């Protein structure tokens, strides 16, 4: 019978409200005995109670606590010295419950609290006066005070630290749990199975709630999760902090690149993945449309606010309808409009470049202001307002569009089977009335639509102004190639014409939407938006990425035009200055006599108005100094801000930190993402490369199959060909510099020889023509003195100007060499790594890759590589020529300096001869000029004087003959 009871008791939980009375009495006696013994030790020992408690816990652990056995879960259980006590229970709610004797913080029990709620720790309650609720399943005799309750709170806290048993416990309020007061006074009963089930259920529901919350609050800031009070949301927020978040210097308040993530496909799901995910584009289009319409309404109300008073005064007496609130349509919201252009229609008279597109510059209706009556003028103004509201003229574009995007049409949709290309400032503007994004980007849908055929419209007509019921979704196929898609099946995806979406200067939010819709990898998104500088080809699962660098052709044209205008203005200024000088010289020569007569009067008048001018200048300078300080500070701040904005824009465009110096090319990064049925291109500045490729595709669509790989090849080819004109200009400049340097010294020698020959010829002709008119020349010399002096002055000034211009040309030559070398090095920097990129690109085609199918484009890529290698070798050759020209220029400068030194030596030699002749004369004259008695002083004849003069002449002749023989002059 005892064995049956023991077997039956093994299935009973460890805690039960009903147990046998002998066992309870035995436990009470043991507990009372241990308590009395422990209290006696505390009274007899002089040490602190905490130290005694610590010692007793170490040596007499079994005597102090009633928990002697530890199960496999690491929990303590009550037992006797021999075996575990099994308590019988009839309560089914406590079956399988374990006892956890770890101390826990008290929790409020006012209402049900889930496990997922945040548990806030509260201060430890005083154990001297416990205020626990009376458990439902315990008898009043079981409510014994703990032995530890006699300790103070600080002593109890130190004891708990030594025990290292401060843990948090969670209690499921929905299940019946009981508390008991034992020696620990904080023991909690936990149903582990129910707890684990509850945690698993909350975890699954928390994941679902978080996924719904992400879908609902997509693109919001991370700071919105700070006020959440559940542990599941907090844990999910902590997990989100460890996700990949690439750094972005252009982060906005609405979105950031850390929201861009690669959604992993569920391997167990049988639903096929749709590419592209047009639902993301549809949601973004709705949000963008609502935002732009609200902005347009605000702008229209602000624009027409100034006409409110006139409308209120004149609406009662005049006919017509004038709406108080503006009617907002797609025409009034230019961001939602688009323009359709056919690139081949602009090819007139051999023109290979399209005209500039300006569809938004609508012609404003001129107002007639010649009427005298104010009533007629008001009626005209109101009729003009009605036309503007109803028809859409004089659209006031939002300032954020004009300031942020000078090139308004940032999104361009192209397909070779369409008659025209769609240009739009926004993603939503690409859609025609009644059209969806599936009709643009899903090959199976637009191929079926094209096979059914559409109504053609004029390619240059703006589509937003046409009604939706009269406009088809997209234009049909051209009549030249009707059999292109006649036999096409949707299964044969290779025959579907690919779409091409060209994006210029995308925002961070647009980049995020496109990445999610087309399944672009986060690394690709980071490279595009942060401006990857290195040129490369990367292969992904669904696409491959090509990073290719070009140069800003538009900026280069502006620089050339500005430089040409500057040169023309400089030449005009030089001519005008020379003309003014000649006129001023003639005026001064003619008015020289009049100026001498008017000197006295001008001096008198100058003495009167000069002090007044000085006083006015002093006053203006005092006022100017007070204003210049503030204006200079504002100007400096504005210039620094403008410089920072330019650097930021250039960094986004080319990836470089600083703007290139004058003479260097501005790099432009072009990113090409090639899918099987589509192409995405990104660039951050306007460039003509996409226009050229679209025109080329339309011209050659009857002779080749335009695929996505061909579009990528055509873009690379057009970017490479854009460097050819620059290299030709560099070649011409290099050869001109070399020829000018080699002819620099020859021109100087020829000019000197020509001038000497002309002088000698003029002298000989004078002697031959007038051999007997020397006396007449001498007599007429005094009369022609003024003319000779003026002529000599003009010739000396002309020679001085010629020398100055020559030296200036030499200085300009050095500047030309430096600028040309700078240009060569900038192009070499852009072309240096392109050969390796093309080589890797061709390798992708030659190998068996799933993402890059076999085609004939690999043959053309080899031709591009040959072009690049040829251009690089030509640039290296030009660099060597410029280096040699630079050395030749320095040699010419040394020759010129040597020539100058030789001329100076000649002048010094002539001065030496003159000194040799004059020095003896100075000695003789100095001796006879002393204030002493000299020979011949008292003679009345001129004998001594004549003799001294003759001696001096003979001495000068002898000195001249000696120096001429000695130095070879």
Curated annotation (Swiss-Prot):
Compositional bias of kind Basic residues: 24-36
Chain segments annotated as transmembrane: 913-933, 942-962
GO cellular component: fungal-type vacuole membrane; vacuole-mitochondrion membrane contact site
Residue positions where Phosphoserine is found in the record: 114, 175, 182, 383, 576, 582
Pfam families: CorA (PF01544)
Additional note from the record: Present with 259 molecules/cell in log phase SD medium.
Cytoplasmic topology ranges: 1-912, 963-969
A single GO BP: intracellular magnesium ion homeostasis
Residue ranges of the region described as Disordered: 1-49, 96-153, 167-186, 199-256, 559-662, 746-769
Phosphothreonine modification, residue list: 177, 571
Ranges of the Extracellular topological domain: 934-941
Listed Polar residues bias regions: 141-152
GO molecular function: magnesium ion transmembrane transporter activity
Annotated membrane topology: Multi-pass membrane protein
Full protein name: Manganese resistance protein MNR2
Subcellular localization: Membrane
Family membership: Belongs to the CorA metal ion transporter (MIT) (TC 1.A.35) family.
Natural source organism: Saccharomyces cerevisiae (strain ATCC 204508 / S288c)
Biased composition (Basic and acidic residues): 1-11, 37-48, 565-578
Compositional bias segments (type: Low complexity): 13-23, 225-234, 244-256, 590-607, 622-632
Main location (coarse class): membrane
Keywords: Membrane, Phosphoprotein, Transmembrane, Transmembrane helix
